[in-house]
Protein backbone atom coordinates (compact mmCIF):
# COMPACT_ATOMS: atom_id res chain seq x y z
CA UNK A 1 0.00 0.00 0.00
CA UNK A 2 1.52 3.31 -1.12
CA UNK A 3 1.24 6.55 0.84
CA UNK A 4 1.32 10.08 -0.53
CA UNK A 5 3.08 12.62 1.67
CA UNK A 6 2.43 16.36 1.48
CA UNK A 7 6.11 17.16 1.77
CA UNK A 8 5.71 20.94 1.65
CA UNK A 9 3.24 21.01 4.52
CA UNK A 10 5.26 18.59 6.64
CA UNK A 11 8.58 20.43 6.27
CA UNK A 12 7.56 24.10 6.10
CA UNK A 13 6.32 26.57 8.66
CA UNK A 14 7.69 27.12 12.18
CA UNK A 15 7.60 23.42 13.01
CA UNK A 16 9.50 22.48 9.86
CA UNK A 17 12.13 25.15 10.47
CA UNK A 18 12.56 24.04 14.07
CA UNK A 19 12.98 20.42 12.96
CA UNK A 20 15.54 21.42 10.32
CA UNK A 21 17.51 23.38 12.91
CA UNK A 22 17.50 20.41 15.28
CA UNK A 23 18.84 18.16 12.52
CA UNK A 24 21.54 20.70 11.66
CA UNK A 25 22.57 21.00 15.30
CA UNK A 26 22.59 17.23 15.70
CA UNK A 27 24.89 16.69 12.69
CA UNK A 28 27.13 19.56 13.81
CA UNK A 29 27.53 18.10 17.30
CA UNK A 30 28.39 14.70 15.84
CA UNK A 31 31.12 16.25 13.70
CA UNK A 32 32.66 17.84 16.80
CA UNK A 33 33.12 14.35 18.27
CA UNK A 34 34.82 12.92 15.18
CA UNK A 35 38.64 12.66 15.29
CA UNK A 36 39.80 14.79 12.36
CA UNK A 37 42.76 13.96 10.11
CA UNK A 38 45.88 16.08 10.29
CA UNK A 39 45.02 18.22 7.26
CA UNK A 40 41.60 19.32 8.62
CA UNK A 41 41.31 21.73 11.53
CA UNK A 42 37.53 21.84 12.02
CA UNK A 43 34.18 21.04 10.41
CA UNK A 44 31.14 23.28 10.83
CA UNK A 45 27.56 22.55 9.73
CA UNK A 46 25.73 25.73 8.77
CA UNK A 47 22.32 24.82 7.37
CA UNK A 48 19.96 21.98 6.55
CA UNK A 49 16.98 22.00 4.19
CA UNK A 50 14.48 19.27 3.41
CA UNK A 51 14.14 20.24 -0.25
CA UNK A 52 11.00 19.97 -2.36
CA UNK A 53 10.98 16.32 -3.46
CA UNK A 54 8.96 13.95 -1.30
CA UNK A 55 10.03 10.35 -0.62
CA UNK A 56 8.06 7.36 -1.94
CA UNK A 57 6.54 5.33 0.88
CA UNK A 58 5.13 1.82 0.59
CA UNK A 59 3.77 -0.05 3.60
CA UNK A 60 5.06 -3.62 3.66
CA UNK A 61 3.73 -5.04 6.91
CA UNK A 62 1.89 -4.44 10.19
CA UNK A 63 3.40 -6.45 13.04
CA UNK A 64 4.25 -6.54 16.73
CA UNK A 65 6.85 -3.98 17.89
CA UNK A 66 10.40 -5.11 18.46
CA UNK A 67 11.27 -6.12 22.03
CA UNK A 68 13.95 -3.40 22.19
CA UNK A 69 11.23 -0.76 22.05
CA UNK A 70 9.77 -2.02 25.35
CA UNK A 71 12.86 -1.38 27.45
CA UNK A 72 11.96 0.96 30.30
CA UNK A 73 14.45 3.81 30.32
CA UNK A 74 14.30 5.38 33.79
CA UNK A 75 18.00 6.11 34.24
CA UNK A 76 17.52 9.83 33.88
CA UNK A 77 14.95 10.13 36.68
CA UNK A 78 16.78 7.90 39.11
CA UNK A 79 20.04 9.64 38.33
CA UNK A 80 18.59 13.06 39.11
CA UNK A 81 17.16 11.82 42.41
CA UNK A 82 20.51 10.36 43.42
CA UNK A 83 22.38 13.52 42.50
CA UNK A 84 19.97 15.67 44.54
CA UNK A 85 20.37 13.36 47.53
CA UNK A 86 24.16 13.51 47.27
CA UNK A 87 24.07 17.27 47.00
CA UNK A 88 21.83 17.52 50.08
CA UNK A 89 24.13 15.28 52.10
CA UNK A 90 27.22 17.14 51.00
CA UNK A 91 26.00 20.56 52.13
CA UNK A 92 24.50 19.46 55.46
CA UNK A 93 27.88 19.71 57.21
CA UNK A 94 30.04 22.83 56.72
CA UNK A 95 33.17 20.70 57.05
CA UNK A 96 31.94 18.43 54.26
CA UNK A 97 31.25 21.45 52.11
CA UNK A 98 34.74 22.83 52.63
CA UNK A 99 36.33 19.49 51.95
CA UNK A 100 34.34 18.91 48.75
CA UNK A 101 35.21 22.36 47.45
CA UNK A 102 38.91 22.19 48.23
CA UNK A 103 39.95 18.58 47.98
CA UNK A 104 37.48 15.74 47.40
CA UNK A 105 34.34 15.00 45.43
CA UNK A 106 30.90 14.55 46.99
CA UNK A 107 31.03 10.85 46.15
CA UNK A 108 33.88 10.35 48.64
CA UNK A 109 31.91 12.17 51.39
CA UNK A 110 29.10 9.64 51.32
CA UNK A 111 31.36 6.66 51.81
CA UNK A 112 31.76 5.31 55.36
CA UNK A 113 35.04 6.08 57.05
CA UNK A 114 36.35 2.59 57.71
CA UNK A 115 39.66 0.83 57.55
CA UNK A 116 38.78 -0.48 54.09
CA UNK A 117 39.15 2.90 52.43
CA UNK A 118 41.72 5.64 52.09
CA UNK A 119 40.34 7.43 55.20
CA UNK A 120 41.20 5.08 58.07
CA UNK A 121 39.17 4.60 61.23
CA UNK A 122 40.62 7.05 63.81
CA UNK A 123 39.57 4.80 66.70
CA UNK A 124 41.29 1.74 65.32
CA UNK A 125 43.99 0.34 67.61
CA UNK A 126 46.49 0.16 64.77
CA UNK A 127 45.76 3.76 63.87
CA UNK A 128 46.25 5.13 67.42
CA UNK A 129 49.45 3.16 67.84
CA UNK A 130 51.15 4.85 64.89
CA UNK A 131 49.62 8.33 65.20
CA UNK A 132 50.26 9.02 68.88
CA UNK A 133 52.77 11.71 67.98
CA UNK A 134 52.32 15.04 69.83
CA UNK A 135 52.54 16.93 66.52
CA UNK A 136 48.87 17.90 66.64
CA UNK A 137 49.04 20.09 69.73
CA UNK A 138 51.06 22.96 68.17
CA UNK A 139 48.25 23.60 65.66
CA UNK A 140 46.27 25.61 68.22
CA UNK A 141 49.35 27.11 69.93
CA UNK A 142 52.36 29.00 68.64
CA UNK A 143 51.49 29.05 64.95
CA UNK A 144 48.60 31.40 65.72
CA UNK A 145 51.20 34.15 65.93
CA UNK A 146 52.19 33.87 62.28
CA UNK A 147 50.69 36.79 60.28
CA UNK A 148 48.23 35.66 57.67
CA UNK A 149 49.75 37.73 54.87
CA UNK A 150 53.43 37.16 55.64
CA UNK A 151 55.46 34.37 54.02
CA UNK A 152 55.67 31.28 56.15
CA UNK A 153 58.72 29.07 56.18
CA UNK A 154 58.39 25.32 56.06
CA UNK A 155 57.91 23.88 59.54
CA UNK A 156 59.14 20.32 60.03
CA UNK A 157 56.51 18.00 61.38
CA UNK A 158 53.50 20.09 60.36
CA UNK A 159 51.37 18.28 57.74
CA UNK A 160 50.85 20.38 54.64
CA UNK A 161 54.25 22.05 54.55
CA UNK A 162 54.19 25.77 53.83
CA UNK A 163 50.54 25.90 52.79
CA UNK A 164 48.55 28.18 55.15
CA UNK A 165 45.15 27.74 53.53
CA UNK A 166 43.93 24.70 55.41
CA UNK A 167 45.70 25.78 58.62
CA UNK A 168 43.85 29.08 58.91
CA UNK A 169 40.55 27.43 58.06
CA UNK A 170 41.01 25.11 61.02
CA UNK A 171 42.37 27.70 63.48
CA UNK A 172 39.66 30.28 62.76
CA UNK A 173 37.02 27.63 63.32
CA UNK A 174 38.17 27.21 66.91
CA UNK A 175 39.29 23.61 66.47
CA UNK A 176 42.14 22.32 68.58
CA UNK A 177 44.20 19.25 67.83
CA UNK A 178 43.68 17.99 71.39
CA UNK A 179 39.93 18.63 71.46
CA UNK A 180 38.70 17.86 67.95
CA UNK A 181 37.78 14.23 67.14
CA UNK A 182 40.17 12.84 64.60
CA UNK A 183 37.25 11.64 62.50
CA UNK A 184 36.17 15.22 61.86
CA UNK A 185 39.72 16.26 61.03
CA UNK A 186 40.29 13.32 58.68
CA UNK A 187 36.91 13.68 57.02
CA UNK A 188 36.71 17.45 56.69
CA UNK A 189 40.10 19.12 56.89
CA UNK A 190 42.08 20.06 53.79
CA UNK A 191 44.83 17.72 55.09
CA UNK A 192 42.88 14.64 54.04
CA UNK A 193 45.72 13.07 52.12
CA UNK A 194 48.52 13.94 54.55
CA UNK A 195 46.99 14.24 58.04
CA UNK A 196 46.44 10.59 58.76
CA UNK A 197 49.91 9.61 57.54
CA UNK A 198 52.93 10.64 59.63
CA UNK A 199 55.18 13.15 57.94
CA UNK A 200 58.75 12.23 56.94
CA UNK A 201 59.92 13.95 60.13
CA UNK A 202 57.48 12.02 62.31
CA UNK A 203 58.11 8.93 64.38
CA UNK A 204 55.39 6.58 63.13
CA UNK A 205 55.83 3.59 60.85
CA UNK A 206 53.88 4.04 57.61
CA UNK A 207 53.62 0.37 56.84
CA UNK A 208 51.40 -0.22 59.85
CA UNK A 209 48.50 1.88 58.60
CA UNK A 210 48.82 1.50 54.84
CA UNK A 211 45.79 -0.31 53.36
CA UNK A 212 46.23 -3.63 51.68
CA UNK A 213 46.13 -3.83 47.85
CA UNK A 214 42.53 -5.05 47.98
CA UNK A 215 41.49 -2.17 50.19
CA UNK A 216 43.36 0.31 48.05
CA UNK A 217 41.60 -0.98 44.94
CA UNK A 218 38.24 -0.11 46.48
CA UNK A 219 39.37 3.44 47.09
CA UNK A 220 40.78 3.71 43.56
CA UNK A 221 37.30 3.49 42.06
CA UNK A 222 36.96 7.24 42.68
CA UNK A 223 38.89 8.22 39.58
CA UNK A 224 38.00 11.92 39.89
CA UNK A 225 40.63 12.39 42.61
CA UNK A 226 44.12 12.25 41.04
CA UNK A 227 45.69 11.60 44.42
CA UNK A 228 43.76 8.36 44.80
CA UNK A 229 44.95 6.88 41.49
CA UNK A 230 48.12 4.80 41.83
CA UNK A 231 50.72 4.74 39.14
CA UNK A 232 51.06 1.85 36.74
CA UNK A 233 54.05 0.60 38.63
CA UNK A 234 52.18 0.48 41.94
CA UNK A 235 49.07 -1.02 40.41
CA UNK A 236 50.79 -4.02 38.81
CA UNK A 237 54.16 -4.56 40.48
CA UNK A 238 56.05 -7.70 39.70
CA UNK A 239 55.13 -10.26 42.31
CA UNK A 240 53.94 -7.85 45.04
CA UNK A 241 50.21 -7.21 44.69
CA UNK A 242 49.17 -10.15 42.52
CA UNK A 243 49.04 -13.71 43.74
CA UNK A 244 49.05 -16.71 41.44
CA UNK A 245 47.12 -19.92 41.36
CA UNK A 246 48.99 -23.20 41.43
CA UNK A 247 48.72 -23.35 37.66
CA UNK A 248 50.54 -20.05 37.33
CA UNK A 249 47.65 -17.79 36.28
CA UNK A 250 47.54 -14.55 38.25
CA UNK A 251 44.50 -13.26 40.05
CA UNK A 252 43.18 -9.84 39.10
CA UNK A 253 41.54 -8.91 42.38
CA UNK A 254 43.24 -5.51 42.34
CA UNK A 255 41.09 -4.51 39.36
CA UNK A 256 37.52 -4.20 40.71
CA UNK A 257 36.08 -3.19 37.37
CA UNK A 258 37.22 -6.18 35.33
CA UNK A 259 37.01 -8.75 38.12
CA UNK A 260 34.35 -11.38 37.67
CA UNK A 261 33.77 -11.32 41.42
CA UNK A 262 32.70 -7.69 41.45
CA UNK A 263 29.27 -7.61 43.13
CA UNK A 264 28.28 -4.49 41.18
CA UNK A 265 28.59 -6.41 37.91
CA UNK A 266 27.05 -9.62 39.21
CA UNK A 267 24.05 -7.92 40.83
CA UNK A 268 23.23 -5.71 37.86
CA UNK A 269 19.54 -6.32 37.13
CA UNK A 270 18.28 -6.96 33.62
CA UNK A 271 16.59 -4.03 31.87
CA UNK A 272 12.99 -3.46 32.88
CA UNK A 273 10.47 -4.16 30.16
CA UNK A 274 7.16 -2.39 29.66
CA UNK A 275 4.05 -4.48 29.42
CA UNK A 276 2.79 -5.21 25.93
CA UNK A 277 -0.69 -3.96 25.11
CA UNK A 278 -3.11 -4.95 22.35
CA UNK A 279 -3.09 -1.43 20.88
CA UNK A 280 0.69 -1.46 20.29
CA UNK A 281 1.61 -1.84 16.64
CA UNK A 282 4.53 -1.47 14.26
CA UNK A 283 4.74 -0.55 10.57
CA UNK A 284 7.44 -1.69 8.16
CA UNK A 285 7.64 0.81 5.33
CA UNK A 286 9.77 0.74 2.19
CA UNK A 287 11.26 4.22 1.63
CA UNK A 288 12.77 5.37 -1.66
CA UNK A 289 14.15 8.88 -1.96
CA UNK A 290 16.06 10.66 -4.73
CA UNK A 291 15.54 14.29 -3.85
CA UNK A 292 17.16 17.66 -3.40
CA UNK A 293 17.78 17.65 0.32
CA UNK A 294 20.52 20.18 1.10
CA UNK A 295 23.25 20.35 3.74
CA UNK A 296 25.87 23.10 3.94
CA UNK A 297 29.22 22.44 5.65
CA UNK A 298 32.58 24.16 5.95
CA UNK A 299 35.85 22.29 6.53
CA UNK A 300 39.00 24.26 7.30
CA UNK A 301 42.03 22.80 5.49
CA UNK A 302 45.50 23.26 6.95
CA UNK A 303 48.34 24.11 4.57
CA UNK A 304 51.83 22.90 5.52
CA UNK A 305 53.77 25.33 3.30
CA UNK A 306 56.10 27.02 4.14
CA UNK A 307 55.72 25.48 7.62
CA UNK A 308 53.36 22.92 9.22
CA UNK A 309 49.83 24.24 9.78
CA UNK A 310 50.84 27.56 8.25
CA UNK A 311 47.37 28.73 7.28
CA UNK A 312 43.82 27.39 7.18
CA UNK A 313 41.59 27.69 4.12
CA UNK A 314 37.83 27.15 4.35
CA UNK A 315 36.43 24.49 2.05
CA UNK A 316 32.70 24.90 1.53
CA UNK A 317 30.77 21.71 0.82
CA UNK A 318 27.15 21.78 -0.29
CA UNK A 319 25.24 18.51 -0.32
CA UNK A 320 22.67 19.03 -3.06
CA UNK A 321 20.86 15.70 -2.95
CA UNK A 322 20.95 12.09 -1.84
CA UNK A 323 19.68 8.76 -3.11
CA UNK A 324 18.27 6.49 -0.44
CA UNK A 325 16.55 3.11 -0.47
CA UNK A 326 15.69 1.27 2.73
CA UNK A 327 13.05 -0.04 5.11
CA UNK A 328 11.83 2.21 7.90
CA UNK A 329 10.34 0.99 11.18
CA UNK A 330 7.65 3.04 12.93
CA UNK A 331 6.38 1.62 16.24
CA UNK A 332 3.60 3.11 18.37
CA UNK A 333 3.73 2.17 22.08
CA UNK A 334 1.87 4.11 24.77
CA UNK A 335 2.04 7.65 23.42
CA UNK A 336 5.55 7.01 22.15
CA UNK A 337 6.65 6.66 18.54
CA UNK A 338 9.91 4.82 17.90
CA UNK A 339 11.58 5.36 14.53
CA UNK A 340 14.60 3.79 12.84
CA UNK A 341 15.77 2.09 9.65
CA UNK A 342 16.73 -1.53 9.16
CA UNK A 343 20.09 -2.71 7.95
CA UNK A 344 20.04 -4.31 4.48
CA UNK A 345 20.29 -7.88 5.79
CA UNK A 346 17.54 -7.32 8.39
CA UNK A 347 15.31 -5.72 5.78
CA UNK A 348 15.66 -8.66 3.40
CA UNK A 349 14.90 -11.08 6.24
CA UNK A 350 11.70 -9.27 7.25
CA UNK A 351 10.19 -8.07 3.98
CA UNK A 352 11.90 -10.43 1.53
CA UNK A 353 14.33 -9.71 -1.27
CA UNK A 354 11.60 -9.87 -3.94
CA UNK A 355 9.72 -6.87 -2.55
CA UNK A 356 12.93 -5.05 -1.79
CA UNK A 357 14.51 -4.79 -5.26
CA UNK A 358 13.35 -1.34 -6.32
CA UNK A 359 16.77 0.14 -5.53
CA UNK A 360 18.13 -1.17 -8.82
CA UNK A 361 16.32 1.64 -10.64
CA UNK A 362 18.47 4.37 -9.10
CA UNK A 363 22.13 3.41 -9.46
CA UNK A 364 24.72 5.41 -7.59
CA UNK A 365 28.40 5.29 -6.72
CA UNK A 366 27.84 2.48 -4.22
CA UNK A 367 25.36 0.63 -6.44
CA UNK A 368 26.51 -2.06 -8.82
CA UNK A 369 24.97 -2.84 -12.19
CA UNK A 370 21.99 -5.14 -12.50
CA UNK A 371 24.06 -8.02 -13.84
CA UNK A 372 23.63 -11.32 -12.08
CA UNK A 373 27.31 -11.67 -11.25
CA UNK A 374 27.58 -8.36 -9.39
CA UNK A 375 26.85 -8.08 -5.69
CA UNK A 376 23.52 -6.77 -4.50
CA UNK A 377 23.55 -3.10 -3.50
CA UNK A 378 22.07 -4.15 -0.16
CA UNK A 379 24.73 -6.59 0.83
CA UNK A 380 26.30 -6.35 4.26
CA UNK A 381 28.66 -3.43 4.85
CA UNK A 382 27.14 -0.92 2.38
CA UNK A 383 25.49 2.28 3.57
CA UNK A 384 21.80 2.94 3.03
CA UNK A 385 22.80 6.27 1.50
CA UNK A 386 23.59 5.05 -2.00
CA UNK A 387 24.61 8.41 -3.43
CA UNK A 388 25.45 11.84 -2.03
CA UNK A 389 25.73 14.65 -4.56
CA UNK A 390 28.07 17.41 -3.41
CA UNK A 391 29.49 20.67 -4.71
CA UNK A 392 32.76 22.02 -3.29
CA UNK A 393 34.27 25.49 -3.31
CA UNK A 394 37.59 26.56 -1.80
CA UNK A 395 39.19 29.99 -1.66
CA UNK A 396 38.48 32.46 -4.42
CA UNK A 397 38.03 31.63 -8.09
CA UNK A 398 39.98 32.90 -11.09
CA UNK A 399 38.39 32.63 -14.53
CA UNK A 400 35.89 30.12 -13.18
CA UNK A 401 38.61 27.79 -11.89
CA UNK A 402 39.40 27.09 -8.26
CA UNK A 403 42.77 28.15 -6.93
CA UNK A 404 43.23 24.78 -5.17
CA UNK A 405 41.89 21.68 -6.85
CA UNK A 406 43.18 18.86 -4.63
CA UNK A 407 40.21 18.73 -2.27
CA UNK A 408 39.18 15.14 -2.97
CA UNK A 409 40.50 13.85 0.36
CA UNK A 410 38.46 16.37 2.33
CA UNK A 411 35.32 15.62 0.34
CA UNK A 412 35.68 11.88 0.83
CA UNK A 413 36.29 12.29 4.56
CA UNK A 414 33.28 14.55 5.13
CA UNK A 415 30.93 12.39 3.07
CA UNK A 416 32.16 9.24 4.79
CA UNK A 417 31.34 10.83 8.15
CA UNK A 418 27.86 11.80 6.94
CA UNK A 419 27.22 8.17 5.97
CA UNK A 420 28.63 6.92 9.27
CA UNK A 421 26.46 9.28 11.34
CA UNK A 422 23.37 8.18 9.44
CA UNK A 423 24.13 4.47 9.74
CA UNK A 424 25.11 4.57 13.42
CA UNK A 425 22.34 6.83 14.66
CA UNK A 426 19.32 5.77 12.60
CA UNK A 427 19.87 2.09 11.79
CA UNK A 428 18.48 -0.52 14.20
CA UNK A 429 19.29 -1.29 17.03
CA UNK A 430 19.71 2.50 17.29
CA UNK A 431 16.38 4.31 17.20
CA UNK A 432 14.75 7.58 18.16
CA UNK A 433 11.71 8.01 20.37
CA UNK A 434 9.16 10.81 20.01
CA UNK A 435 6.60 11.63 22.70
CA UNK A 436 3.13 12.39 21.35
From Swiss-Prot:
Q: Does the keyword Glycoprotein apply?
A: no
Q: Which residues form the SMP-LTD domain?
A: 1-436
Sequence ranges of Basic and acidic residues compositional bias: 85-98, 244-255
Do you know which Pfam families this protein is assigned to?
MMM1
Main location per the UniProt record: mitochondrion
Record carries keyword Endoplasmic reticulum: yes
Q: Locate the compositionally biased regions of type Polar residues.
A: 190-206, 222-243, 256-267
Protein's membrane topology: Peripheral membrane protein
Q: Keywords in UniProt for this one?
A: Endoplasmic reticulum, Lipid transport, Lipid-binding, Membrane, Mitochondrion, Mitochondrion outer membrane, Transport
UniProt-annotated location(s): Mitochondrion outer membrane; Endoplasmic reticulum membrane
Q: Which InterPro entries match?
A: Mdm12 (IPR027532), MMM1_dom (IPR019411), SMP_LBD (IPR031468)
User: Which GO MF term does the entry hold, naming one?
Assistant: lipid binding
Q: Which GO terms describe its cellular component?
A: endoplasmic reticulum membrane; ERMES complex
Where are the compositionally biased (Acidic residues) regions?
73-84
Q: What is known of its domains?
A: The SMP-LTD domain is a barrel-like domain that can bind various types of glycerophospholipids in its interior and mediate their transfer between two adjacent bilayers.
**Known partners and oligomeric status:** Component of the ER-mitochondria encounter structure (ERMES) or MDM complex, composed of mmm1, mdm10, mdm12 and mdm34. A mmm1 homodimer associates with one molecule of mdm12 on each side in a pairwise head-to-tail manner, and the SMP-LTD domains of mmm1 and mdm12 generate a continuous hydrophobic tunnel for phospholipid trafficking.
Q: Which family does it belong to?
A: Belongs to the MDM12 family.
**Described purpose of this protein according to its UniProt entry:** Component of the ERMES/MDM complex, which serves as a molecular tether to connect the endoplasmic reticulum (ER) and mitochondria. Components of this complex are involved in the control of mitochondrial shape and protein biogenesis, and function in nonvesicular lipid trafficking between the ER and mitochondria. Mdm12 is required for the interaction of the ER-resident membrane protein mmm1 and the outer mitochondrial membrane-resident beta-barrel protein mdm10.
Protein name per its UniProtKB record: Mitochondrial distribution and morphology protein 12
Gene that this polypeptide is encoded by: mdm12
Amino acid sequence: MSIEVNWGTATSGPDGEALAERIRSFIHDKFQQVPLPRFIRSVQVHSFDFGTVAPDLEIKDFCEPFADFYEDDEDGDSGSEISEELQHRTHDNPWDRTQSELNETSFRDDRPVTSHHALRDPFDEDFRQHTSSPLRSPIALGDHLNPHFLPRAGTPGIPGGTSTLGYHLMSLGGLSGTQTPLAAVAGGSPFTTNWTDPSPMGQGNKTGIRPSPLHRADADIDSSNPASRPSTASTHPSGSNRSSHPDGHPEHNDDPISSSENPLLQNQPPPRMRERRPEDFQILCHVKYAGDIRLSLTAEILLDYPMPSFVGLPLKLNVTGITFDGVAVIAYIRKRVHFCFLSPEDAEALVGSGSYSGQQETPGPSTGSSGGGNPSPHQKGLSLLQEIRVESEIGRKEDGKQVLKNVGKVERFVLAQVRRIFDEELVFPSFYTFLI
